[in-house]
């Protein structure tokens, strides 16, 4: 388990990561607008595809409520570009190849699968206010049903 656990009221850790088009996206560039930042293990895998498509299907709901949506994974921008195109996504996916942002947000740590322990990406979602403060931190979420749960938690 990661030693980092962000809680409501915490300042979101800064990041500068390339998106699917290799354009740097920073936490500061999200300032002034509420944001949903979600961390996922790998693009184009069943669970991550489901989660991304669920965010896409609800994107109008989130944007109408003033939220931008950003996904972060260890994938390279080239893979993210293909994933965005294949799934027709209309939000940025960021590449965190060295896991710096994952670790800063506590979205990387000890996982268990079939009795085996290993280090990996912890599927996590953070809701940030206009000033970059965490208003909601959700760790170890399930891909299926996560976006529906998030909308309920946000009253959307």
Q: Where are the regions that the model predicts?
A:
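Chalcogenol-based redox active-site neighborhoods
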Residues: 1-156
């Amino acid at each position: 388990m990661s030693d980092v656990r962000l809680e409501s009221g915490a300042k979101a850790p800064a990041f500068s990561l390339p998106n699917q088009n290799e354009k740097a996206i920073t936490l500061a560039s999200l300032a002034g607008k509420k944001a949903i930042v979600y961390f996922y293990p790998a693009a184009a895998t069943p669970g991550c595809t489901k989660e991304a498509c669920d965010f896409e299907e609800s994107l109008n709901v989130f944007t109408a409520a003033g939220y931008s949506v950003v996904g972060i994974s260890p994938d390279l921008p080239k893979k993210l570009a293909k994933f965005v195109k294949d799934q027709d996504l209309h939000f940025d996916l960021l590449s965190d190849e060295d896991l710096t942002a994952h670790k800063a947000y506590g979205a990387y740590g000890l996982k268990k699968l079939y009795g085996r322990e290993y280090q990996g990406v912890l599927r996590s979602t953070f809701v940030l206010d206009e000033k970059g403060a965490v208003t909601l931190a959700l760790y170890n979420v399930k891909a299926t049903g996560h976006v529906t749960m998030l909308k309920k938690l946000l009253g959307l």
